[in-house]
Amino acid sequence: HVEVSAKKNGFDWEPVMRAIIQIESKGNPAAVNGPYVGVLQISPVLVKECNNILRSTGSTKRYSLSDRFNATKSKEMFVIIQGFYNPLNSIEKAIRLWSGGIRYNVAKTQAYLSKVLRHMSN
């Protein structure tokens, strides 16, 4: 069973997600940039990965591509990805992972990290 609220293992992802949402879409759930859509600019690959994670945990819950336009479901997918790839809840890793993918490059995600952290401190 995967916890799909903003709090995972007692960790609150809401401040991180709020900052990323401001940068990615300015909060517009209808935002589209190529294959990336919704408030968190989620790709089809990420939806598939969330469904694979859910399947591996025995959950019957699945996400569709249209769920990316739903802010709540987008946040749920963010939390699922972080829970799987970032089990220690590192804010830095969460931001780099969101920008650069699972095999992110530190140098290439540095500017994005700085931008998100600036938004979080405002």
Regions found by a protein language model. Give the residues of each.
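Catalytic glycan-binding domains that act on GlcNAc-containing polysaccharides
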Residues: 1-122
